[in-house]
Every structure is written in structure tokens, then in C-alpha cells.
Regions:
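Active-site rim/loop-helix segments in enzyme catalytic domains that contact anionic ligands
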Residues: 1-114, 144, 250, 257
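Metal-dependent de-N-acetylase/amidase catalytic core
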Residues: 1-11, 85-86, 97-272
Length: 272
């Protein structure tokens, strides 16, 4: 029996985040007929590494509005590579990542609009401040969206599940206190080229058809996540809430011939 289409909302603290940590999963859900929306609360200027490097070198103030537009277009283009056309960019400043009530309200508005069954976002204690703050605001927005909000026509809504990225934000001692063992592993082997194309749209952060960065990270991060599942590429997630069953489930979906575990498909990927 076919399941009903789901509404999936991915939230990243910066424009690249949802793509690098869940882009393959997003593409899989689109292919399954689900509605996928990606949301970025900030303009992401603090992570425009190309502009930051140039400014450090020449000390000439760039056109900040042009840089913000560039970052926004990259996210739109990257999402399109995955088949995602519903891209929400709230455009708030990310220089000092703090919880902002207005952003919480706006995230709650998006929740009320798309009524997600699933939200995918960063781990709550991710050591990148913009990641952790985005998740804190997301959880607060979920609380707000679950009740009656004066002046809002959205029905109260609570997603069935939240999945946190099971990858480290940075390599530092803070991350040692966070579980990175996934409760769910999504086989993204069939969508790994789509994810590579999406990541190569992020030229402001060193990606692109002429850069080896995506091939390196794709094999290192997504390849590593698939090892114990005996699949070439995967994305890992940690469920926020326990799932309820009448009997214990055994999920066999996605099992592959273990001989393909070491396939390195990105060696053959030809960027456009």
C-alpha cells in the first residue's frame, strides 16, 4: 500500500547547511513524490568564505547586498539540482548568532504554511553557533506553531518527527559531548550525483565544477556514513522523538549487495 505524500521541511543555519547534511535525503523525498521545503533563517554572509578571504587580503569593503543576493541564488540553484523548488530565505543577519523572537515567529509561519510531517535540522548542541541557534529557534517555533497564534490563520500543527544531522559541526572538544551515532541512515547512493551538483553550486564556499572539494567531502562524509550499513553513500540522522509501534519493526528497505559498499561513484562524476 502506497503511503501518502509527506511534507518535509529542512532548516539550515546558513544557506549551504541543509544541502551538505541532507541534500541526498531531500532528493530522495522529491523522487518519492513528497513535498520538500528548505528554509534558511539568515543571509549567511558570515560564511561567504570567498568574500571574507578577499576582504582580508585587500581590505576593500565589498557590496554586502550583492553578496547576500549571491548566497541566496546559490541556495535556490542548489535546491533546484535536488528537485526542490520551495526555498524560503528569511535573510536575517548571522554575524552574532542569538535567539531572536521575530525569527522564531517567521519559522513558525513557515511551519503553519507547509505543515511538515518531518523537520530536518542541526543537532541541538552543534558547536557552530549559527547551527545550534537555528535549531533552538526551530524547536521554539514548533512549540509556537502547535498552538493558537493571534492574528495567524494557520491551523495548530506539530510535526510527527524531527531528525537532527548526525555529523559534527566542527572538530573540537565540544563535539565530544554530542552523540553522532545515527538512529536512521538514509541510502543516498541513487541521488549522490544530484547532491554533488547541488554542492557545486556553492562557489562562495570553495565548491564548483573546477574544485575537488565536493568529491573529497562526498567520499569522506557520505561515504563514511554508509560504511556500516554496507552501502556506498548515506546520510545519518538522530530522531528527536521515540517512534511508537505495536511490534518491533525490521526495516530492510535500502539494503544493497555488500560488494558495492566500496563503490566510489564520485570518481566518475563529471561536473557540468
Amino acid at each position: 500500500m502506497a503511503r501518502k505524500p509527506l511534507s518535509v521541511l529542512t532548516i539550515g543555519g546558513h544557506p549551504k547547511d541543509a544541502i551538505i547534511d541532507s541534500g541526498g535525503t531531500m532528493a530522495n523525498h522529491v523522487a518519492a513524490g513528497d513535498r520538500v521545503t528548505t528554509l534558511c533563517p539568515t543571509h549567511g554572509l558570515s560564511h561567504h568564505t570567498a568574500a571574507i578571504a578577499k576582504y582580508k587580503a585587500d581590505r576593500k569593503m565589498p557590496d554586502l547586498e550583492a553578496l547576500k543576493s549571491e548566497l541566496a541564488q546559490e541556495l535556490v540553484d542548489a535546491a533546484a539540482e535536488l528537485g526542490v523548488t520551495d526555498v524560503r530565505i528569511l535573510g536575517h543577519d548571522d554575524a552574532i548568532p542569538v535567539v531572536v523572537p521575530q525569527i522564531i515567529e517567521e519559522i513558525a509561519d513557515v511551519i503553519g504554511d507547509v505543515l511538515p510531517d518531518i523537520i530536518i535540522t542541526h543537532a541541538p548542541y552543534d558547536s557552530v553557533p549559527g547551527h545550534a541557534v537555528a535549531t533552538e529557534m526551530t524547536l521554539l517555533a514548533m512549540e509556537a506553531a502547535s498552538g493558537i497564534r493571534p492574528g495567524k490563520n494557520y491551523p495548530p500543527h506539530k510535526p510527527s518527527q524531527v531528525f537532527f544531522h548526525a555529523v559534527a559541526g566542527r572538530t573540537n572538544v565540544q563535539e565530544t559531548n554530542i552523540s553522532r551515532v545515527p538512529t536512521h541512515v538514509v541510502d543516498i547512493t541513487d541521488s549522490v550525483y544530484k547532491k554533488a551538483a547541488a554542492m557545486n553550486r556553492m562557489r562562495t564556499q570553495g565548491y564548483g565544477p573546477d574544485s575537488p572539494q565536493q568529491r573529497k567531502l562526498g567520499e569522506a562524509i557520505d561515504g563514511h556514513m554508509g560504511i556500516h550499513a554496507r552501502i556506498p553513500y548515506a546520510e545519518g540522522f538522530i530522531a528527536h522523538n521515540p517512534s511508537v509501534y505495536t511490534t518491533l519493526p525490521v526495516v530492510i528497505e535500502g539494503e544493497r549487495d555488500p560488494s558495492h559498499m566500496t563503490d566510489m561513484l564520485l570518481d566518475n562524476y563529471k561536473p557540468q
